Design a protein with these regions (language model features):
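Polytopic transmembrane helical bundles with strong interfacial aromatic enrichment
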Residues: 1-177
Length: 177
């Protein structure tokens, strides 16, 4: 089974079809995804700005990280949960969307970044210059990720898929014919 076959199979399940065709549930899930991204991304941005010394200078870095941890976790669960539902509902369109794959590559890079700088984030005071590098890289990766994610909705369906989905592509609720 290819990735495309898997995406089509997921998309054609009853829950994903119902989600895709719902004029109420789909926007709620999208709102949950964007809210989770704002929460998760916002907490990361605050952490990075503190590591760079641009915000909350009077608060120790470890305190900022500890205080934001639960909010990051809530945002992460929202982003992943709602994102999986959004992917499943229009999986074939996402498969062909270059911005989706760019977003996935940047998500992978986020994971690599987190692993590479794990010791730095655990004790940023011990590695001040590395913490600043980690924060700069994090901000750039997340800006790219959010840009790619928002671009997904504005990608035009290629002509060869138009008979299947119509020219509206990602912006409409429909069933694959």
């Amino acid at each position: 089974m290819s990735i495309l076959d898997l995406f089509r199979w997921i998309q054609d399940t009853a829950p994903m079809t119902a989600l895709r065709e719902s004029a109420l549930v789909y926007p709620i899930v999208m709102t949950g995804h964007l809210t989770g991204m704002a929460l998760f991304g916002g907490m990361i941005c605050i952490t990075d700005m503190r590591l760079l010394g641009w915000a909350m200078r009077d608060t120790p870095v470890n305190d900022v990280i500890d205080q934001l941890r639960v909010w990051k976790q809530i945002g992460f669960v929202m982003v992943v949960g709602c994102g999986a539902m959004l992917l499943g509902s229009k999986a074939e369109l996402y498969y062909y969307n270059p911005f989706y794959w760019t977003k996935m590559a940047l998500l992978l890079l986020v994971g690599v970044h987190a692993l590479a700088f794990r010791k730095v984030y655990a004790n940023p005071a011990a590695f001040p210059s590395k913490a600043k590098v980690a924060a700069c890289l994090s901000l750039f990766i997340w800006i790219g990720l959010v840009t790619a994610g928002r671009s997904i909705a504005y990608w035009d369906v290629p002509a060869e898929l138009t008979p299947i989905y119509g020219s509206e592509g990602m912006t409409t609720h429909h069933t694959r014919k």
